[in-house]
């Protein structure tokens, strides 16, 4: 496939790691955040991949821990006038699209996503223009501008069902931006899919040989894999699914030991779900290999206690999410299509 932008050759500079806080500093910021949430009539929504102390704070303050879409849905239904989104930038944008009347704050607007960065809207528009006969389906991990170009937005939890539905209608698909998830969906459905070639820097680093060695060390363990992982890793899995689906699989599988191939942030909620089971990280480096993300998104790690307190206290252009009104209206169309489709699956 020829594209103007090649995500495979792009090197994304990682943000600096947050300065560690002392125990006293953590206690200070936790109490400050709790007070500011009440004063601002705000609720905190956190992604599964944020650090455990952030997820714990969201729980303690009546917030939400979930995937990106459920974060936005929770925020839209919640009576709070302000949403504090602990995640990456596209999650804040999605929350704003679904709750345009609310103030959306983020600890930092510099928290990126390699899938979002790997799908620049100008190049993606040109790619779509070159294939006008195809239905455009984009993953939730994209900018508002890319969503606005799409016919459908989709999450990993319903990707197979949606593409199977579109395939049954005889539609040919453009899929963006995750090539591994696109490959997985194509194999599951047999649909005619033309994939953009983006990848998640975390899931792309899982190594087959190292995972095989870990499996040999723990032959009684089940392997849980997020479909953003390379095909060879997916083929080793006992369960494949989105973050929420992997947590459900952890409860359902009889195995007492689980090897988990996704961001280690998920361990907080997964361990709550299966307190008696042992969770092991799938390896992201092996012999002769090194890892950059090492199973944790560096941009998710930017959502620290100090940054959250600052967002609630200062607001302003460094923390508030804005989406152009015309762009918002266009992006809402494929998002609502997805929500309606998801409702039919649940119903």
Swiss-Prot record:
It is an enzyme of class 2 (transferase). It holds the Pfam family NadA. Belongs to the quinolinate synthase family. Type 1 subfamily. GO terms for molecular function: 4 iron, 4 sulfur cluster binding; metal ion binding; quinolinate synthetase A activity. The keyword Cytoplasm applies. GO terms for biological process: 'de novo' NAD biosynthetic process from L-aspartate. Catalyzes the condensation of iminoaspartate with dihydroxyacetone phosphate to form quinolinate. It comes from Escherichia coli O1:K1 / APEC. Iminosuccinate binds at residues 47, 68, 139-141, 156, 226-228, 243. Its cofactor is [4Fe-4S] cluster. Binds 1 [4Fe-4S] cluster per subunit. This is Quinolinate synthase. PANTHER family: QUINOLINATE SYNTHASE, CHLOROPLASTIC (PTHR30573:SF0), QUINOLINATE SYNTHETASE A (PTHR30573). The keyword rRNA-binding does not apply.
